[in-house]
Amino acid sequence: MSLTITEYFKLTKPGVLYLLMITAGASMVLATNFNLNLVKALTGFIGIAFIAGSSAAINQILDFKYDSVMERTGKRPIVTGKISIFSATLFAIFLLFIGSALILYFNNFLTWALTFATWVFYAFIYTKILKFSGVLNIVIGGLAGSMPPLLGWTAVVGTID
């Protein structure tokens, strides 16, 4: 069981997710001048993390053929067969649904809309189009990675100031 949990966790790209969430969390603190509403902060943090993890899983689902021929990505759970594409898809949908529910119920629509737009951008536009479009693909694709400070801010404040 723990092997499976570990493999599902790997679908979220935890190294990248960790860095994204540091910036989201820091912006939550700064947006409230160190006076956080803990419910909004925790639900926003978890919701953003779940949706970001979902987009990482979608990226691995769509890229598994490419991942299988690269040394750096050749041991990912879908490539190795430890998790099926179907199971990974269900996991990604679950994370997207729970993350969305948390943000919509406890935070606000603006945060959800921005987070969902980031999910679409990374999971589909970057993964299927930009990645193969030329030398500036990573710069344009970096838009998704730059969103967490804004997402964290709006999760606790509700506006873009």
List the model feature ranges, each with a label:
Residues 72-113:
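Multi-pass membrane catalytic core of lipid/isoprenoid biosynthesis enzymes
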Residues 3-16, 77-88, 125-144:
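Interhelical loop and helix-boundary elements at the membrane-water interface
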Residues 21-25, 76-79, 95, 140-156:
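Small-residue-rich segments of transmembrane alpha-helices in multi-pass membrane proteins
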Residues 104-110, 127-136, 153-160:
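Membrane-interface helix caps and helix-loop-helix hairpins in membrane proteins
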Residues 22-26, 30-64, 100, 113, ...:
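Membrane-embedded alpha-helical segments that form the functional core of polytopic membrane enzymes
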Residues 19, 39-47, 87-91, 95, ...:
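Alpha-helical transmembrane segments of integral membrane proteins
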Residues 2-9, 18, 22, 27-30, ...:
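Alpha-helical transmembrane segments of multi-pass membrane proteins predominantly involved
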